[in-house]
UniProtKB/Swiss-Prot annotation:
This protein's UniProt keywords: Cytoplasm, Hydrolase, Protease, Serine protease
Main subcellular location of this protein, as a coarse class: cytoplasm
Family designation: Belongs to the peptidase S14 family.
Reaction it catalyzes: Hydrolysis of proteins to small peptides in the presence of ATP and magnesium. alpha-casein is the usual test substrate. In the absence of ATP, only oligopeptides shorter than five residues are hydrolyzed (such as succinyl-Leu-Tyr-|-NHMec, and Leu-Tyr-Leu-|-Tyr-Trp, in which cleavage of the -Tyr-|-Leu- and -Tyr-|-Trp bonds also occurs)
Active-site residue numbers: 102 (nucleophile), 127
GO cellular component: cytoplasm; endopeptidase Clp complex
Cellular location(s): Cytoplasm
Broadest EC class assigned to this enzyme: hydrolase
UniProt-listed Enzyme Commission number(s): 3.4.21.92
Protein name: ATP-dependent Clp protease proteolytic subunit
GO MF terms, alphabetically ordered: ATP-dependent peptidase activity; ATPase binding; serine-type endopeptidase activity
Oligomer status and interactors: Fourteen ClpP subunits assemble into 2 heptameric rings which stack back to back to give a disk-like structure with a central cavity, resembling the structure of eukaryotic proteasomes.
Stored InterPro entries: ClpP, ClpP/crotonase-like_dom_sf, ClpP/TepA, ClpP_His_AS, ClpP_Ser_AS
Amino acid sequence: MKSNSVLIPMVVEQHSRGERSYDIYSRLLKERIIFITGTIEDNMASSIVAQMLFLEAESLDKDIFLYINSPGGIITSGMSIYDTMQFIKPDVNTICIGQACSMAAFLLSSGTKGKRSCLPNARIMIHQPLGGYQGQASDIAIHAEEINKMKKKLNKLMSLNTGQSIKKINKDTERDCFLSAHESIKYGLIDLILTQR
């Protein structure tokens, strides 16, 4: 049987009173770096929100760096991250490493303007919300209406993030729309491509 667990590297720091070891993500959190990796769902979103609130409590003036490599995920989970990004005082730098698709692309575009970036070979994909529901016809209709409301809300916010018209966002998100790093700058999803520190 294969295990899905990933070995998390440990970092050992030497101090005058001995050693202290951290998992790599805890150590990076000390540098105000947070990772969104994998599918965005409630447990992951709660962890991201908690980390942002912790970093805000540590310093209101220092930027937070949100590294994203995600295929997207649940809309409500992503919106809890988005709302927290807007709520906290520190600027949130968003950096795509690998991919930012669907909700992850929305979060990438929602970073502080001028501080949204990706690496040269990253890919970004935007599309309309997906939903799957089964049950009575009346329940399916309720869920379809909710998905349409979410689509309108997300497209309006994406328009504000990118500077694109809602009409263009509606058209481009009708199907999966993949963008390279350079195309993402032109579209307004990001502000710069990082090639080196």
